[in-house]
């Protein structure tokens, strides 16, 4: 019998189906993912390919060697949007494994569809809260790197505390990084870039790779997104930060 989404590993999963409004149900914990209507195509792609491209939240660490079938380094990307740049990176770097987390279900569906189109096999995606995945599902030292590109800036000052880049988050990520693991962030909000730089620089377990001690030019290996290209044409800035674990 062909297994569909989330119907393969966890006894706590109640259903394998995504509904049209993006609701995802579990026996133990139910939550409504970020709003967004799944197209029939996206829902079918998720259900048909989740057994090979999807992972479910679990309370014990993932066995990445078993999941990917090799010992290549695992790069985690949090908040991959529609997933095009993540899939492109996985396609361009077959010597690395990629793990993407996104709570916007249409984005997950689009990412899976594009991965299938490109024939990518070194990518897995998760539809769950990133902090819980880091806490429960990833072993200490298991990651080769973390990518966080254009996270929600929460631009109002009173909402800055909601930004994902906080000292405790960085400490948690560092714990999951292996030796010489990296943290690569990018944002088009200068104020958020300054906060990222401040938080990362304050952690004594990290080294900034920038020659000037601040930002780096966009590296060639980070694909230029349509959103980013449009921003450049409008004169918007983009700031990349790349730190390495000591």
UniProtKB/Swiss-Prot annotation:
Q: Which GO terms describe its cellular component?
A: tRNA methyltransferase complex
Q: What class of enzyme is it?
A: transferase
SUPFAM superfamilies in the record: S-adenosyl-L-methionine-dependent methyltransferases
Q: Which domain of life is it from?
A: Bacteria
Q: Where is the active site?
A: 152
Q: Which Gene3D superfamilies match?
A: Vaccinia Virus protein VP39 (3.40.50.150)
Q: Which reaction does it catalyse?
A: guanosine(46) in tRNA + S-adenosyl-L-methionine = N(7)-methylguanosine(46) in tRNA + S-adenosyl-L-homocysteine
Which InterPro entries does the annotation name?
A: SAM-dependent_MTases_sf, tRNA_(Gua-N-7)_MeTrfase_Trmb, tRNA_methyltr_TrmB_bact
Binding positions for substrate per the UniProt entry: 156, 188, 225-228
Q: What is its EC number?
A: 2.1.1.33
Which Gene Ontology BP annotations are present?
RNA (guanine-N7)-methylation; tRNA methylation
The residues that the entry says bind S-adenosyl-L-methionine are: 77, 102, 129, 152
Enumerate the GO terms in the molecular function aspect: tRNA (guanine(46)-N7)-methyltransferase activity
Q: In which pathway does it act?
A: tRNA modification; N(7)-methylguanine-tRNA biosynthesis
What UniProt keywords apply to this chain's record, in alphabetical order? Answer: Methyltransferase, S-adenosyl-L-methionine, Transferase, tRNA processing
PANTHER family in UniProt: 3-DEOXY-D-MANNO-OCTULOSONIC-ACID TRANSFERASE/TRNA GUANINE-N 7 - -METHYLTRANSFERASE, PENTACOTRIPEPTIDE-REPEAT REGION OF PRORP DOMAIN-CONTAINING PROTEIN
To which protein family does this belong?
Belongs to the class I-like SAM-binding methyltransferase superfamily. TrmB family.
| Main function | Catalyzes the formation of N(7)-methylguanine at position 46 (m7G46) in tRNA.
Quote the protein name from its UniProt record. Answer: tRNA (guanine-N(7)-)-methyltransferase
Provenance organism? Haemophilus influenzae (strain ATCC 51907 / DSM 11121 / KW20 / Rd)
The gene behind this protein is trmB
């Amino acid at each position: 019998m062909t297994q569909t989404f989330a119907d393969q590993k966890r006894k706590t999963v109640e259903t394998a189906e995504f509904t049209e409004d993006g609701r995802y149900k579990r026996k133990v914990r139910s939550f409504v993912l970020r709003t967004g209507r799944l197209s029939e195509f996206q829902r079918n792609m998720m259900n048909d390919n989740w057994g090979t491209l999807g992972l479910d939240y679990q309370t014990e660490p993932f066995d990445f060697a078993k999941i990917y079938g090799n010992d290549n380094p695992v790069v985690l990307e949090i908040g991959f949007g529609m997933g095009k740049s993540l899939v492109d990176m996985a396609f361009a770097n077959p010597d690395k494994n990629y793990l993407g987390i996104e709570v916007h279900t249409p984005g997950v569906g689009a990412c899976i569809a594009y991965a299938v189109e490109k024939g990518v096999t070194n990518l897995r995606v998760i539809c769950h809260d990133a902090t819980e995945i880091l806490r429960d599902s990833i072993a200490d030292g298991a990651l080769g790197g973390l990518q966080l590109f254009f996270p929600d800036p929460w631009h109002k000052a009173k909402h800055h505390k909601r930004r994902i880049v906080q000292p405790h988050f960085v400490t948690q990520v560092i714990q999951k990084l292996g030796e010489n693991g990296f943290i690569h962030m990018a944002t088009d909000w200068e104020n958020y870039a300054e906060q990222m730089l401040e938080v990362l620089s304050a952690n004594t377990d990290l080294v900034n790779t920038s020659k000037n001690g601040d930002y780096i030019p966009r590296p060639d290996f980070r694909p230029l997104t349509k959103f980013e290209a449009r921003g450049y044409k409008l004169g918007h800035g983009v700031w990349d930060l790349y730190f390495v674990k000591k």
